[in-house]
């Protein structure tokens, strides 16, 4: 009965996404109900992965015409090179290609030089086109070449200097993470008549290259992949039959009606009101779904779990080809086996 370790835990049925003012950048993600303590466990793990492990794009180096190092200045440009480099760190990119690319920027004064002045390449999009890089005086010209790449986390400038870097190439500290801020809160919530559950609320802000909803999904997938190595057993079989005897792909006991399970009147009425007719209908329900049934409480849940356990079944199982089209005929056909 090892499956009880995970199959009988309450799980959130779905995520609730509450978009912020800019839905592509800000959202609140709500998951409930969770077993007590799981809000903190999952919230902390997701936050750390969101901030550290998602792939994004950034400018990794710049080469400006007639500039030998970052402590130089460019005639007619109000900012010195150090300030230009700092402003380049604020350019937000989206790259749909894996290989590093080079972009160019050419501008003439007077006026502001913005991220939108960067000439985009195939598969690369500048997201914050109004971001100011520098200001040019009358008659001033600025020409630069930018190296952009995909990566994760933070990479210091010295790591972005190629071994064969030409004179004048200035490496830049790269912040690849598309996630800017993550906070979470765990509060009590109820499920049916039970109050002792967690509600996880996460506020996620990205740079726009990735939606908050996708960011959370990718972080969860990373955690899932990392934990898979710790699972040292095969999943127990679902409610199917490998020999497919009598032409069925599932246990014929699932065709038995729930009103034959000798449940209490209260439990039986709750199942009836929820249109649960056969055992096959019942075992596909999760605990969370059952507790949302009107007038269905923990006592009824425990009663049903005990009855199913005696049959080698449990809530939350998958059933192949259920319900069959001719379910009533099949139920009559196998009635003598019950």
Swiss-Prot record:
Gene3D superfamilies: 5' to 3' exonuclease, C-terminal subdomain, DNA-directed RNA polymerase, insert domain, RNA polymerase, RBP11-like subunit
Keyword terms: DNA-directed RNA polymerase, Nucleotidyltransferase, Transcription, Transferase
GO terms for cellular component: cytoplasm; DNA-directed RNA polymerase complex
Keyword Cell membrane: no
GO biological process, one term: DNA-templated transcription
Highest taxon of source: Bacteria
Alpha N-terminal domain (alpha-NTD): region residues: 1-234
Pfam families: RNA_pol_A_bac (PF01000), RNA_pol_A_CTD (PF03118), RNA_pol_L (PF01193)
Reactions catalysed: RNA(n) + a ribonucleoside 5'-triphosphate = RNA(n+1) + diphosphate
Keyword Transport: no
MF-aspect GO terms: DNA binding; DNA-directed RNA polymerase activity; protein dimerization activity
Chain intervals for the UniProt region annotation (Alpha C-terminal domain (alpha-CTD)): 250-338
Enzyme class label: transferase
Physiological role: DNA-dependent RNA polymerase catalyzes the transcription of DNA into RNA using the four ribonucleoside triphosphates as substrates.
Family: Belongs to the RNA polymerase alpha chain family.
Subunit structure: Homodimer. The RNAP catalytic core consists of 2 alpha, 1 beta, 1 beta' and 1 omega subunit. When a sigma factor is associated with the core the holoenzyme is formed, which can initiate transcription.
Protein name as it appears in the record: DNA-directed RNA polymerase subunit alpha
The species this protein was found in: Paracoccus denitrificans (strain Pd 1222)
């Amino acid at each position: 009965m090892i499956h009880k370790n995970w199959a009988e835990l309450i799980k959130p049925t779905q995520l609730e996404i509450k978009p912020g003012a800019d839905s592509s950048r800000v959202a609140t993600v709500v998951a409930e109900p969770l077993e007590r303590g799981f809000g903190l466990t999952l919230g902390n793990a997701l936050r750390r992965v969101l901030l550290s492990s998602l792939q994004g794009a950034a400018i990794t180096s710049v080469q400006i015409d007639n500039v030998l190092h970052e402590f130089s200045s460019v005639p007619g440009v109000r900012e010195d090179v150090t300030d230009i480099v700092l402003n380049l760190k604020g350019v937000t990119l989206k790259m749909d290609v894996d290989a590093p690319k080079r972009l160019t920027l050419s501008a003439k004064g007077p006026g502001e030089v913005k991220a939108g002045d960067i000439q985009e390449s195939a598969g690369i999009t500048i997201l914050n086109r109004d971001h100011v890089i520098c200001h040019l005086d009358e008659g001033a010209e600025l020409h630069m070449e930018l190296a952009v790449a995909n990566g994760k986390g933070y990479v210091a400038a010295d790591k972005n200097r190629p071994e064969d870097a030409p004179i004048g190439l200035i490496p830049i500290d790269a912040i690849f993470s598309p996630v800017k801020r993550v906070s979470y809160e765990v509060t009590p919530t109820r499920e049916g008549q039970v109050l002792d559950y967690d509600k996880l609320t996460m506020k996620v802000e990205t740079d726009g290259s990735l939606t908050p909803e996708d960011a959370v999904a990718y972080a969860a997938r990373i955690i899932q992949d990392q934990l898979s190595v710790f699972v040292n057993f095969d999943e127990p079989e679902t409610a199917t039959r490998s020999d497919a005897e009598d032409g069925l792909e599932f246990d014929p006991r699932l065709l038995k009606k729930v009103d034959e399970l000798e449940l209490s009147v209260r439990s039986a009425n709750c199942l009836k009101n929820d249109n649960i007719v056969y055992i096959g209908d019942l075992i596909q329900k999760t605990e969370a779904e059952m507790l949302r049934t009107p007038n269905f409480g923990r006592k009824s849940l425990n009663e049903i779990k005990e009855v199913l356990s005696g049959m080698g079944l449990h809530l939350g199982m998958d059933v192949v080809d259920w319900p069959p089209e001719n379910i009533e005929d099949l139920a009559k056909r196998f009635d003598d086996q019950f």
